[in-house]
Amino acid sequence: MSFLQPSRQKYRKTQRGTLKGKSFRGNQVAFGEYGIQALESHWITQRQIEASRIALVRSLRKGTKVWIRIFPDKPYTKKPAEVRGGGGKGDPEGYVAVVKPGRIMFEFSDVPQDMAEEAFRKVSAKLPIKVRLVKAGGMSI
């Protein structure tokens, strides 16, 4: 199973940062007919993105175009089990995409609305945040 991750990066570990504010970039449907939009802030892991992508592709018919609009480029670290505090920051465990409210995470096109709603229902179960289905032009469904 190949997960999304950066091919190269300048620093191995990053600071956690905050999840304040909303998304000012990537908040409109740009490529497809429908989009899945985040309503909350959260870190979305590379595993969650892949699980959502598989659920989306399997619930749509062949010939449907799918775009993934988020990329996990932030490394997150974790200390091993049963290790006391201190001793420095843990080793990188994986990568996450920082998602803020308003961000379009997935887009797809060439599909009827009822099939789009069913695909949305399956994808939303794979994500740790509240999401909504939006149509191109900014209309919520």
Curated annotation (Swiss-Prot):
The gene behind this protein is rplP
Q: Which GO terms fall under molecular function for this chain's record?
A: rRNA binding; structural constituent of ribosome; tRNA binding
Q: What is this protein called?
A: Large ribosomal subunit protein uL16
Query: Can you tell which superkingdom this protein's organism belongs to?
Result: Bacteria
Quaternary structure and interacting proteins, as annotated: Part of the 50S ribosomal subunit.
Q: What does this protein do?
A: Binds 23S rRNA and is also seen to make contacts with the A and possibly P site tRNAs.
Similarity-based family? Belongs to the universal ribosomal protein uL16 family.
CC terms in the record's Gene Ontology section: cytosolic large ribosomal subunit
The UniProt keyword set, sorted, is:
Ribonucleoprotein, Ribosomal protein, RNA-binding, rRNA-binding, tRNA-binding
Which Gene3D superfamilies does this one have?
A: Ribosomal protein L10e/L16
